[in-house]
Structures are given as structure tokens and as C-alpha cells.
Curated annotation (Swiss-Prot):
It is found in: Nucleus. One of its GO terms (cellular component) is nucleus. MRNA binds at residues 14, 37, 106-110, 117-121, 127-128. InterPro entries: NCBP2, NCBP2_RRM, Nucleotide-bd_a/b_plait_sf, RBD_domain_sf, RRM_dom. This is Nuclear cap-binding protein subunit 2. Pfam families: RRM_1. Residues 34-112 form the RRM domain. It comes from Aedes aegypti (Yellowfever mosquito). Belongs to the RRM NCBP2 family. Gene3D superfamilies: 3.30.70.330. Keywords: mRNA processing, mRNA splicing, Nucleus, RNA-binding, RNA-mediated gene silencing. Component of the cap-binding complex (CBC), which binds co-transcriptionally to the 5' cap of pre-mRNAs and is involved in various processes such as pre-mRNA splicing and RNA-mediated gene silencing (RNAi). The CBC complex is involved in miRNA-mediated RNA interference and is required for primary microRNAs (miRNAs) processing. Also involved in innate immunity via the short interfering RNAs (siRNAs) processing machinery by restricting the viral RNA production. One of its GO terms (molecular function) is RNA cap binding.
């Protein structure tokens, strides 16, 4: 009799659009992984702060900070890799939606860190979600990059 591992913490609808492999393979890896994607971090949150919070759920293999691909400075996300899936499930259950550095962090399953994914995918080097942000968010560098460069209005007029 074969059994299918079903996570006790449900998978979200988010999928990495740059995943190298089939949708089926990505789903399989997400159900087995002990790696988490952590989003909505302040640009000033340190690896030590992340370690202090996430180590409450278990032993951490490594933390990979998300970096602006041009400046090599933190850009609001990271990957936390645990030794055990159960510890990652605890972090999903108990840390997702809590505050770190006065921000509500988003914790999601990740199919496994691959070199290069630590860099932001936005045109300006950071995260895509920060490119077009029109609100002023001090913890994420102020206004979105397009607003800072005065391009948002021009882009909207051209549409």
C-alpha cells in the first residue's frame, strides 16, 4: 500500500513562476520540503533577528537573505531551511502572520533554495512587488522604485 505524504499545514496557491521543472514536480517538492520563503521583511531586519525568531520552532540548517541584485543589500525576503520538515511545519503554523521588526511576516513553503534565487527579480534589483508600490513604507525603502524615479506616472500615461 502506497501512502502520499500530505502536509499538515496546507500549501498556498503561490508557485515560483521561475521553477525549473514541471508543475507536478514542484508540487511534490513543496510537500516534502523543509525550506520556507519568508516575505514582507523590513530591509533592516537582520539574519540574527530571523534566526532568533525561527529557531524557536527547531534547528535551522541555514538562512539565505534576499538581496538586491545590483546593490547586494537586503530587499525584504529570505529563505529559512530547517533540518526537519516538522520544524518547518511548526514555523508555518506559529510564525506566519506574526510581527518581526514591526511588520507582519509572510511564511510560505518553498520547493528548495537554488543559487541565484536570493536576488530580487525586479527591474531595479529588488523585489517586483516593491517596483510599483505607491505608498511610503520606511521599512522597505520609502516609495516604490518607479515612483522614486518618477516613472510610474509616465508608465500609466503610456498605457
Amino acid at each position: 500500500m502506497t501512502s502520499v505524504h500530505t502536509p499538515s499545514v496546507a500549501l498556498s496557491k503561490y508557485r515560483d513562476q521561475h521553477f525549473k521543472g514541471s508543475r507536478h514536480e514542484q508540487e511534490r517538492l513543496l510537500r516534502l520540503t523543509s525550506t520556507l520563503y519568508i516575505g514582507n521583511l523590513s530591509f533592516y531586519t537582520t539574519e540574527e533577528q530571523i534566526h532568533e525568531l525561527f529557531s524557536r520552532c527547531g534547528d535551522i540548517r541555514r538562512i539565505v537573505m534576499g538581496l538586491d541584485k545590483f546593490k547586494k543589500t537586503p530587499c525584504g525576503f529570505c529563505f529559512v531551511e530547517y533540518y526537519a520538515r516538522d520544524d518547518a511545519e511548526s514555523a508555518m503554523r506559529y510564525i506566519n502572520g506574526t510581527r518581526l521588526d514591526d511588520r507582519i511576516v509572510r511564511v510560505d513553503w518553498d520547493a528548495g533554495f537554488v543559487e541565484g534565487r536570493q536576488y530580487g527579480r525586479g527591474k531595479s534589483g529588488g523585489q517586483v512587488r516593491d517596483e510599483y508600490r505607491q505608498d511610503h513604507d520606511l521599512g522597505r525603502g520609502g516609495y516604490g522604485k518607479m515612483v522614486q524615479m518618477g516613472q510610474l506616472g509616465a508608465n500609466m500615461r503610456d498605457s
